């Protein structure tokens, strides 16, 4: 794929030499791969993004005025966290949590400014990197689950659930959704050769996601894929393209159904699937279950303007919040509790407004927005605060908003 025409709208990209552009794009590909390896601290993703920041700043990274609201909200969120953690910084885990939160905010701004220029090419490199990383993480989880790596079962699984290169099977499952959506788009839209390769990658990711036995990830993939397909049909430029998307999607659903039937014929997989698919899990029910804690925590949040500080919720309740919006109130008081959902839902509103903007990167935009929206919903039932891929998507969303400004202005002038 040639990217020469995609960088012309941005001054710094247009002025950069081919070698610089190639280096910048390669770093974004590497960031996508590194996002899938987070079972060690600091993770490769932190290292790659730090190197990328140095390279991009040295080669002309620009901060745009459109990012001012993003900067302000990220600052206020982390200011709230820091204020509420002031008396807890002697605890190493709290200090590490605060440092990670500030760094995640930095990566959002970094990704936003990077993808605001040379947008189509950089998004494509991130897409490719994420797919490679997802395949690696999935293969690791599959190998661990089926004891294919000597001594790797304990490292690559947790509670007989695949976790691959992640610490938690739930996070593995959540991470795989965006790369799976990218692969799905390729299967239904690209030429046969590329479509087949994407189908193989998708099958590997689907198996990895299944073996993670994450209910949220299963439901998330189904809902986000359905939402993305609807958007692809609505934004298609021809009837033939719409027909291909619909037919191929139906074939893909049939294939996944057959694969699921085959896998569930294995007793170990079937038993775990039935257990995880149940909606009457003990930790979800009761006064101090997942949803009971949400109600009690919300009552506490109204009475505590300065919260209780990061990682303190388990001192009051049997488990953590499992709700990122509640956790913002608990960890950062009213400042973070108000600013965090404000940032998330402002991004969602802007995301809907950009669905039908005709830009060269519309296809990846639909996948990223669908996956982001799914994670926003998942944040009501699980803590997503430090998921690298969540902040990666947030940064890409704002980068695409900024890059789309010339196109939205052009569309507005045509209407007038």
Q: Model regions: which residues?
A:
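Membrane-embedded alpha-helical segments of multi-pass membrane proteins
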Residues: 41-59, 98-110, 171-180, 219-226, ...
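Membrane-interface catalytic loops of GT-C/OST-like multi-pass glycosylation enzymes that act
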Residues: 92, 96, 166-169, 213-217, ...
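A membrane-periplasm/extracellular boundary helix in multi-pass inner-membrane enzymes
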Residues: 229-280, 295-302
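Transmembrane signal-anchor hairpin modules in multi-pass inner-membrane enzymes, especially those
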Residues: 1-96, 114-128, 186-196, 357-362, ...
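Alpha-helical transmembrane segments of multi-pass inner-membrane proteins
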Residues: 3, 25, 29-32, 124-158, ...
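Long extracytoplasmic/lumenal interhelical loops at the membrane interface
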Residues: 151, 156, 278-335, 351-356
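Transmembrane alpha-helices of multi-pass inner-membrane enzymes
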Residues: 50-56, 225, 368-376, 384-416
């Amino acid at each position: 794929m040639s990217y020469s025409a995609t960088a012309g709208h941005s001054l710094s990209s247009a002025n950069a030499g081919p070698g610089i552009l190639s280096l910048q794009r390669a770093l974004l590909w590497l960031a996508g791969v590194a996002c899938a390896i987070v079972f060690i601290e600091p993770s490769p993703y932190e290292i790659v993004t730090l190197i990328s920041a140095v390279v991009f700043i040295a080669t002309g990274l620009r901060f745009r005025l459109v990012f001012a609201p993003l900067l302000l909200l990220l600052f206020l969120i982390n200011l709230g966290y820091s204020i509420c953690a002031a008396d807890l910084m002697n605890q190493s885990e709290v200090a590490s949590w605060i440092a990670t939160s500030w760094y995640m905010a930095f990566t959002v701004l970094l990704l936003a400014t990077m993808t605001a220029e040379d947008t189509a090419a950089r998004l494509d490199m991130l897409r490719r990197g994420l797919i490679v990383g997802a395949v690696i993480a999935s293969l690791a989880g599959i190998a661990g689950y089926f004891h294919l790596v000597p001594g790797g079962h304990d490292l690559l699984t947790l509670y007989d659930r695949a976790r691959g290169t992640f610490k938690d099977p739930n996070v593995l499952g959540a991470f795989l959704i965006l790369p799976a959506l990218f692969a799905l788009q390729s299967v239904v839209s690209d030429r046969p050769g590329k479509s087949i390769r994407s189908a193989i990658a998708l099958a590997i990711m689907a198996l990895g996601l299944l073996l993670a036995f994450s209910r949220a990830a299963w439901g998330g993939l189904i809902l986000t894929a359905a939402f993305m397909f609807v958007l692809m049909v609505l934004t298609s430029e021809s009837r033939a393209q719409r027909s291909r998307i619909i037919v191929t999607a139906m074939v893909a659903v049939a294939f996944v159904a057959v694969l699921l039937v085959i896998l569930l014929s294995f007793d170990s997989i079937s038993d775990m699937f039935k257990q995880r698919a149940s909606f009457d899990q003990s930790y979800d029910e009761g006064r101090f279950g997942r949803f009971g804690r949400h109600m009690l925590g919300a009552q506490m949040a109204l009475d505590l303007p300065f919260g209780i500080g990061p990682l303190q919720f388990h001192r009051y309740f049997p488990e953590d919040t499992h709700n990122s919006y509640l956790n913002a109130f608990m960890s950062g008081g009213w400042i973070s509790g108000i600013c965090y959902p404000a940032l998330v839902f402002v991004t969602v509103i802007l995301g809907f407004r950009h669905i039908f903007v005709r830009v060269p990167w519309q296809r990846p935009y639909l996948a990223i927005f669908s996956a982001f929206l799914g994670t926003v919903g998942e944040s009501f039932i699980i803590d997503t605060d430090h998921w690298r891929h969540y902040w990666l998507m947030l940064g890409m969303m704002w980068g695409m908003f900024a890059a789309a400004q010339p196109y939205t202005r052009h569309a507005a002038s045509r209407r007038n």
